[in-house]
Each structure stands twice: as C-alpha cells, then as structure tokens.
C-alpha cells in the first residue's frame, strides 16, 4: 500500500491519472490508427474511375477519412480500389499488384462491372473481381456517384475498427495471409436468383 500527502482540497492522484492516461486494448488502438490512415492504391479501368477521380476533389474532402494520399506503388498502400471493367488479361496484373501490398490490406470493388461483370456477360470479362481477390466492400452503381465511394470508406472504417485481424494474422507459406474463399458472390447467390419467379414492383418500394 502506498501513501501520499497533500492538501485536503487537492485533486486525488486517481483523478489526475484518469485525466492524463488513456486506457484501451492494443488491438483497438492499432485498429483505430489504421482506420484513420488508409493509403489507397487506385486501379481505374473504365468510366467508374472518372467518378473515383471526382471523389478526390476538394468538394468531397476525402481527407476527412484519412484516405486522400493516393500511393503510386502498391508496396506503400493498404487499400486497393478496383473501379471499372476487369478483363481477363488484366486479372493477372491486378492480382500481382494486390500480392505486393503488405498486410493488413483491404479491397473496395467499385461499380457494377467490378462487382459482377456488369452488362459484359462475355468470355473476356471477369464476372466479379471477388473471383480472385477478397473484396471487403462493394460499391453498386453504373457508374456509382462519388458519394457512394465516401459511404464505402465509412463502411470500411467501421469494419477495420471492429476486426481483430491487425494483431492476429495467420502466417502462410510466403507471409501473412487470411482465409479467402474464391467463390464470387454472384455465383454464391445464383440459385437464389434462379428461384425467383416473381419480381417486386419497383413502384411499391
């Protein structure tokens, strides 16, 4: 037991310590710092990239999310934003760029073409970037507005703040890795889509 001597009207040592110390878990502190310091690496392929470039203008103030510094190399980035149509010949370079990013790393799929192939249901277009990359947030639209990308950043920040991945990464053969099921969401929901026999009235919603 320790004793301290002070004036009766002086502030208690416990109160002084509470005012000058911050108590938190290390996982939460690391997640908080990472969610407010995203370093994006943009991979623009078609018209969705125009909307993404618009989101970088001062009108939308992407600096509010700590993601205004676009990196020129994937080795300095932890967020990959794929915007536009991903052709099969571009899938390999895109995967190489993703593999050069350090863990932890996140992926945003922006636009209908990146999400599911969009209107291009043909042999030369990848039907969803999630068939070879683990996507964290999907941004719908053709093309999506810059506000949709801002919402995606907010969703990604909330995901980063709650996940325990920053300090609990599973080690793979070549370095840190995380589980990834290479089944596109479009294929996973195919049976449910094919079972639909009646479409909802858009005027009723």
Swiss-Prot record:
Localization annotation: Cell inner membrane
Entry EC no(s): 7.1.1.-
Cofactor (UniProt): [4Fe-4S] cluster
Disulfide bonds: none
Any single GO BP term: electron transport coupled proton transport
One GO MF term: NADH dehydrogenase (ubiquinone) activity
Catalytic activity: a quinone + NADH + 5 H(+)(in) = a quinol + NAD(+) + 4 H(+)(out)
InterPro entries given in the database record: NADH_UbQ_OxRdtase-like_20kDa, NADH_UQ_OxRdtase_20Kd_su
GO cellular component labels: plasma membrane; respiratory chain complex I
Membrane topology per record: Peripheral membrane protein
One matching Pfam family: Oxidored_q6
Cofactor: binding comment: Binds 1 [4Fe-4S] cluster.
Keywords: 4Fe-4S, Cell inner membrane, Cell membrane, Iron, Iron-sulfur, Membrane, Metal-binding, NAD, Quinone, Translocase, Transport, Ubiquinone
Amino acids binding [4Fe-4S] cluster: 47-48, 113, 142
Record-stated family: Belongs to the complex I 20 kDa subunit family.
Complexes and interactors: NDH-1 is composed of 14 different subunits. Subunits NuoB, C, D, E, F, and G constitute the peripheral sector of the complex.
Function comment: NDH-1 shuttles electrons from NADH, via FMN and iron-sulfur (Fe-S) centers, to quinones in the respiratory chain. The immediate electron acceptor for the enzyme in this species is believed to be ubiquinone. Couples the redox reaction to proton translocation (for every two electrons transferred, four hydrogen ions are translocated across the cytoplasmic membrane), and thus conserves the redox energy in a proton gradient.
Record protein name field: NADH-quinone oxidoreductase subunit B 2
Organism of derivation: Cereibacter sphaeroides (strain ATCC 17023 / DSM 158 / JCM 6121 / CCUG 31486 / LMG 2827 / NBRC 12203 / NCIMB 8253 / ATH 2.4.1.)
